[in-house]
């Protein structure tokens, strides 16, 4: 009787010891971009779009700013309602201009 009880206790201890707690889930880190860096990115985006669309930078409107895990995107349009997207890397360096 004691042997059955002892064996069942040992099995229970062994099973409890085998269960591992799952590692905590990692959340993506959201780095904040400074306002001055955002303004620099906007000016660079406007300059690139103005050159591409052969117009002045003052006729370019940036309408949206999105942050992704490893990049940034700025959306905008010209006074003729031509849309574009400027892409930047995680450091804020200009990557490319996409016409939409």
From Swiss-Prot:
Lipid group attachment sites (N-palmitoyl cysteine): 18
UniProt keyword Transcription regulation present: no
Signal peptide: 1-17
Gene Ontology CC, one term: plasma membrane
Keywords recorded for this protein, A-Z: Cell membrane, Lipoprotein, Membrane, Palmitate, Signal
Lipidation (S-diacylglycerol cysteine): 18
Taxonomic superkingdom: Bacteria
Topology term for the membrane: Lipid-anchor
PROSITE patterns: PROKAR_LIPOPROTEIN (PS51257)
Entry's localization field: Cell membrane
This protein's record includes keyword Membrane: yes
Record's protein name: Uncharacterized lipoprotein YsaB
Gene name as annotated: ysaB
């Amino acid at each position: 009787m004691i042997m059955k009880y002892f064996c069942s206790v040992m099995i229970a201890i062994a099973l409890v010891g085998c269960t591992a707690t799952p590692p905590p889930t990692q959340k993506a880190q959201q780095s904040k971009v400074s306002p001055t860096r955002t303004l620099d990115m906007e000016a660079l985006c406007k300059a690139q779009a103005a050159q591409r669309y052969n117009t002045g930078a003052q006729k370019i409107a940036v309408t949206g700013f999105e942050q992704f895990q490893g990049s940034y995107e700025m959306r905008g349009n010209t006074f003729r309602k031509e849309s574009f997207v400027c892409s930047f890397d995680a450091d804020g360096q200009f990557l490319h201009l996409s016409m939409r």
